[in-house]
């Protein structure tokens, strides 16, 4: 997920085009094979509006999307996000927006039912014999932790640690 501060366009290039180029270069670098293998697997589909959305979004676009349009699975994934930036202030700004948008709407019983449906879909696709995806496996632990973060994170921010074991404790 690539985000940037809301900023003005320049006569030479729009902010969205500038940051699109920047995000494309970083993504290519991360995917480029090296003698030691791929540096990092970066799934760029995890962004507002998926593959059809902009590769890099402004804070305000991200905020609006999460508040108004994000699917339950996207909100679950966002409970584990960790910003990477050279600027501590940018990270603080991101967390303020992230917290406000993620908890702008309650986690409803319908959302909980959707989590259960997602879990069963994964089990059907991966099979119950898989240690990670089978009953009681890592997928169950992750779904429980992420669901609890969305349900109780606003009132108890200490559970918002992106590391599952720390959040559960």
Kindly give the residue locations of the regions a language model identified.
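A nucleotide- and high-energy phosphate-metabolite-utilizing enzyme signature
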Residues: 1-169
């Amino acid at each position: 997920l690539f985000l940037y501060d809301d900023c003005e366009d320049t006569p030479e290039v729009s902010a969205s085009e500038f940051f699109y180029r920047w995000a494309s270069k970083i993504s290519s670098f991360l995917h480029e094979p090296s003698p030691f293998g791929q540096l990092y697997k970066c799934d760029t589909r995890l962004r507002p509006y998926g593959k059809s959305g902009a590769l890099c979004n402004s804070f305000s676009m991200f905020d609006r999307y999460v508040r108004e349009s994000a699917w339950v699975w996207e909100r679950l994934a966002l409970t584990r996000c960790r910003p990477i930036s050279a600027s501590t202030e940018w990270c603080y700004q991101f967390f303020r927006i992230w917290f406000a948008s993620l908890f702008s709407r309650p986690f409803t019983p319908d959302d909980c039912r959707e989590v259960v449906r997602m879990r069963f879909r994964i089990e059907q696709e991966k099979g119950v014999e898989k240690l990670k995806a089978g009953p009681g496996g890592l997928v169950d632990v992750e779904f429980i932790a992420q669901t609890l973060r969305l349900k109780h994170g606003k009132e108890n921010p200490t559970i918002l640690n992106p590391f599952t074991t720390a959040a559960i404790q």
